[in-house]
Amino acid sequence: MKKYAGIMICMALVMVLASCGRKNAQQSSSKAQQASQTTLQTTSQQSSQPQPSSQTVNNTKGLKVVGSRLCDSKGDPVQLKGISTHGLAWFPDYVNPDCIKELKGWGADVIRLAMYTSEYNGYCTGGNRDQLKDLIRKGVQYASDNDMYAIVDWHVLSEGDPNVYKEEAKSFFSEMSREFASNPQVIYEICNEPCNGTSWDAVYSYANEVIPLIRANSPDSVIIVGTPNWSQDVDKAALKPLPYENVMYALHFYAATHKGDLMDKMTSAIDLGLPVFVSEFGICDASGNGAIDESSANKWVDAMNSRKVSYVCWNLSNKAESSALIKNTCNKTSGFTDEDLTPEGKWLKRVL
C-alpha cells in the first residue's frame, strides 16, 4: 500500500506542477495581449495628437540643392510633385490622415500647407495662431507617415511686401524650424507671392533676416523664397541670388494666363544657375477661376519634367472655383471618386 501511495503522491505532484505551468503560460499570454493592446492604444493616441518634434523620421529623405537642381542626400536629382492646400483657416478638414494617404496614392510626394498671413483669419490678422500651428503639425506628421515632404508656406498675398509682417514671420519660422529640426522632410516657404510693386531688393532684405533663424535650428533644410510679381520674376532673383545654400526660388503660373513668355523666363533663370521650384500652379487663369487650358498645362508639365523642376498644384478644397480639385457639391474630405473631382482634379490625378 505504501508503494502505491507513493506512486499516487508522485502523480498528484506532477498534475499540480502541470496545472501551474498552464496557469503561468496563460498569464504570460494574457500579459502579452494586454501589452499589445496598450501599444495599439498608445499608437492611436499619438496618431490623433501629433508631436512632430519627437516623431521618428526617415533621415535618408534629406534634400539638398546642387547647382540649379533639387537633389536627394546622395546628390542625385529629384523632382517633387504634389498638391497645395487652400487656406488652412478656411479648409482645415482636408488635413487628415486618410486624405494625405489618398494623395500619396495619386502619386503625390509633397503636400504644401498654405497658411495665409493677411487675409480673413490670417495668422497676422486675428486668426487663431495655436490652431493654425496645430494644423501645420498635423500636416507634417501625416506627410511623414506617408513618406512625403511637407512645405510650410507663409502665404504672403494681399499685403504684397513680406516685410509688413516680418517680425511675425521671424518668430513663426524660428519656432517651427526648432520644432521640426530633426525632420528632413520639412521644406520652408518663407513668402508665397510678393506683389503690388514689391522689389527683389525688399524680398532679399526680408529673406536675409528670416533664413538665418531657420538655419540656426535646421542648417540643411531646403528653403523656398518667393519672387516679385506674384512669384514670376525669377529672372531678377537670378541676377542677385541669396548667399545661402539649399535655397530655391518660387515661380508660380496659371496655365490659361501664363504661356511661353513666363516659361521662357523660367528656363532662362535655370540656365543662369537659379534653382527654381514651382510651389504653386493651376490650369485655369490667374484669378484661380475661369476657363481650363489643359493644352497649355501639358506644355508646362513637359517643360518642368525636362528640367526636373518640382511642382505643386493649387488647391485642395471644394471651393466653387476652377482651381479647386474637389467639386463644390462634394463634402467628403477623403475617399474621393473621379465623380467627386473637378476637371483640374481629374487632370492632376492623371498627371501625377
Model-derived features: positions:
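Positively charged n-region of N-terminal signal peptides that target proteins for export
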Residues: 1-9
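C-terminal motif of bacterial Sec signal peptides marking the signal peptidase cleavage site
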Residues: 16-19
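Bacterial signal peptide processing site
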Residues: 21-23
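N-terminal, intrinsically disordered, polar/charged segments of Gram-positive cell-envelope systems
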Residues: 25-56
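N-terminal carbohydrate-binding accessory modules
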Residues: 45-110, 126, 346, 350
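Extracellular glycoside hydrolase catalytic/binding regions
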Residues: 62, 87, 92, 166-187, ...
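Aromatic-lined substrate-binding rim segments of carbohydrate-active enzymes
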Residues: 96-159, 166-171, 175, 215-217, ...
